[in-house]
């Protein structure tokens, strides 16, 4: 099933696109979809992960819900039609 990633700010720059569609299967997780994203856009991985761990300032959303805070993190199972998003830290002044 096609699953769309929406990428924001410098994450879109690293990927070269704001929207990337990956192929996922029933039972796949957010982490599986992220692995597929890194296959398409390998420059993203070092921006999203540090020493194999998700950087604390990166927000991973599934249908608008932060999977790290409100679901099962990268082990959250995907449903058909899910939209995923990666947000870098937001700062302002």
Predicted feature residues:
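Ubiquitin-like/PB1-type beta-grasp interaction modules and other compact soluble beta-rich domains
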Residues: 1-92
């Amino acid at each position: 099933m096609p699953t769309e990633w929406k990428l924001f700010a410098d994450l879109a720059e690293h990927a070269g696109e704001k929207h990337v569609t990956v192929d996922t299967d029933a039972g796949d997780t957010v982490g599986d979809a992220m692995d597929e994203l890194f296959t398409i856009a390998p420059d993203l991985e070092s921006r999203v992960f540090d020493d194999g761990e998700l950087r604390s300032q990166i927000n991973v959303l599934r249908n608008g819900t932060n999977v790290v805070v409100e679901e099962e993190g990268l082990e959250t199972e995907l449903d058909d039609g899910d939209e995923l998003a990666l947000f870098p830290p937001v700062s302002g002044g």
